[in-house]
Amino acid sequence: MQKLVLTLLVTSLLAGCSIFGVYKVDIPQGTPLTKAQASQVQVGMNFQQVRFLLGSPTVTDPLNPLRWDYIYNYIPGTYAKKAKIPAAHGQHLKIYFDGTGTVTKIEGLETIPESQPGLPASKEAILTAPPL
């Protein structure tokens, strides 16, 4: 009988640990861009100018090195969800170059937001963790 009571007590204590939930970290993936940054890229610029403005591309296709992709996804973690920082999905800027390394086409500017949470130029508040 004592084993049964002890087993039930330990089981109920361990089940109580799930009340607090699991801490989840923020998951930023890719290159965060703002519309102000992306709109500076113009047709006629070269590789170096684009890399200076936007940084290295997130994806460069080895089979098509004349296309650069800047992709950004953000999944908020525990504290970001409490601060109501939204998730960011589907931000995909594509820049096409010709054989001489000059920009010929830019696609996806409409997917880039005005600001990104947590970036220095952003008007939105940066998430801060409470002191320990």
Curated annotation (Swiss-Prot):
Annotated signal sequence range: 1-16
Lipoprotein recorded as keyword: yes
Principal cellular location given in the protein's record: membrane
Keyword set, alphabetical order: Cell outer membrane, Lipoprotein, Membrane, Palmitate, Signal
Annotated GO CC locations: Bam protein complex
Membrane topology: Lipid-anchor
Compartments reported by the entry: Cell outer membrane
Source organism superkingdom: Bacteria
Lipidated residue numbers (S-diacylglycerol cysteine): 17
InterPro entries membership: BamE, BamE-like, BamE_dom
Gene Ontology molecular function: protein-macromolecule adaptor activity
Residues where lipid is bound covalently (N-palmitoyl cysteine): 17
Gene Ontology process terms (BP): Gram-negative-bacterium-type cell outer membrane assembly; protein insertion into membrane
Family according to the record: Belongs to the BamE family.
Quaternary organization: Part of the Bam complex.
UniProt function note: Part of the outer membrane protein assembly complex, which is involved in assembly and insertion of beta-barrel proteins into the outer membrane.
Protein name according to UniProt: Outer membrane protein assembly factor BamE
Species: Acinetobacter pittii (strain PHEA-2)
Biological classification of the source: Bacteria, Pseudomonadati, Pseudomonadota, Gammaproteobacteria, Moraxellales
